[in-house]
A protein has these predicted regions:
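ABC ATPase nucleotide-binding domains
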Residues: 1-106
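Glycine-centered small-residue hotspots that permit tight backbone geometry or close packing
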Residues: 22, 78, 112, 153, ...
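Glycine-centered flexibility sites
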Residues: 13-14, 39, 87, 93, ...
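C-terminal boundary and immediately downstream tail of ABC-type ATPase nucleotide-binding domains
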Residues: 100-124, 153, 217
Length: 232
């Protein structure tokens, strides 16, 4: 109420954002357009609205178009999602299905936060060779593929510190950055000149510059062909 009689120039960025969201919600419109509506809000309010907005729109007989750079927000809202890259729609479909089966490597990169880990691999029988010296078992995802060169993609939450490993596929890297949020650890490591990211529950205080042994869940890997298209 205190904001109702104020002009836009008299409101802060966060207040303008909250007012715009409220106006969109109270209107009985058939089409609601929201362009990064949570971007200028403080952390606490942003998290509250992330939970509340899907509930508010669920009971509305309206089409909601929600633009965001956050994959987590797209997954939270569900429905259908279109991913854009350089002004081009790379994929459109059910949100959860797109996350599990991105059409190509560009869509996988857009729809992953932290960024999906990718590198070239060589499949030979039941073995994958990556970074020239690291060998992994092929895993379920690549078992039916012909021998040859592919690009592999593994999401950060499928890479864990060795103490938590439950599947094969180990490698070592030099720790570049560690991010501790209290409930999870995000570890950036240099592997063969590329930066890979591990995201796991709990606190894992790796020292910057130290060696870290990580394990990848190879069964969850995505395999892409020479043109970047998803193969398996």
């Amino acid at each position: 109420k205190p904001m109702l009689k104020r002009k836009p120039s008299e409101l802060s960025g966060g207040q303008q954002q909250r007012t715009a969201i409220a106006r969109a919600i109270v209107k009985d419109s058939d089409l609601i357009l929201l362009d990064e509506p949570l971007a200028n809000l403080d952390y606490k309010l942003r998290e509250e609205l992330r939970d509340e907005l899907p509930k508010l729109f669920a009971g509305r007989n309206a089409i909601v178009v929600y633009a965001t750079t956050e994959p987590s927000e797209a997954l939270l809202f569900g429905g259908n999602t279109a991913t854009l890259h350089e002004g081009r729609v790379t994929q459109f479909g059910q949100t959860s299905a797109m996350y599990r089966r991105p059409r190509d490597i560009v869509t996988a990169e857009v729809f992953s936060d932290p960024p999906i880990n990718t590198t070239k691999v060589e499949k030979n029988g039941k073995t994958l060779t990556l970074f020239g010296t690291i060998t992994w078992p092929v895993g379920a995802a690549g078992a039916a593929l012909a021998d040859g060169a592919y690009t592999i993609g593994i999401r950060p939450h499928h890479i864990t510190p060795a103490v938590q490993a439950k599947s094969s596929g180990s490698f070592q890297g030099r720790v570049l950055v560690t991010e501790l949020s209290g409930s999870e650890s995000v570890i950036h490591v240099d592997v063969g000149g590329k930066t890979w990211v591990s995201q796991s529950h709990g606190i894992h205080p790796f020292e910057v510059g130290a060696a870290a042994t990580l394990h990848a869940d190879v069964d969850q890997a995505l395999f892409f062909g020479p043109n970047g298209e998803l193969i398996s």
